[in-house]
Amino acid sequence: MLFLVISEPRPERPSDVAKARQGFWPWMETYQAKGICKHIYPRVGRGAVAIFDVESNEVLHRILNEWADIIPARFDTYPLVDLAVTKA
């Protein structure tokens, strides 16, 4: 199941969350190495945009809860359709 996730961090001073933010990228690298996070890009200003390929909604829910523990944020999630499926 493919999902586009857009994070909108809480409006805190960047310096207040700098230490926690430093742990975000190493944490995300574990999901990239497993092929779960297909792409992730920082947004200009704050936040990130990611494409996840997960087995279930529950897996995505767990990932987003972990993410929010590192950087408290609101998430917009959009289910996607695999391009190969649409061409079949």
At which residue positions do the language-model features occur?
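Conserved, structured core segments of small domains
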Residues: M1-A88
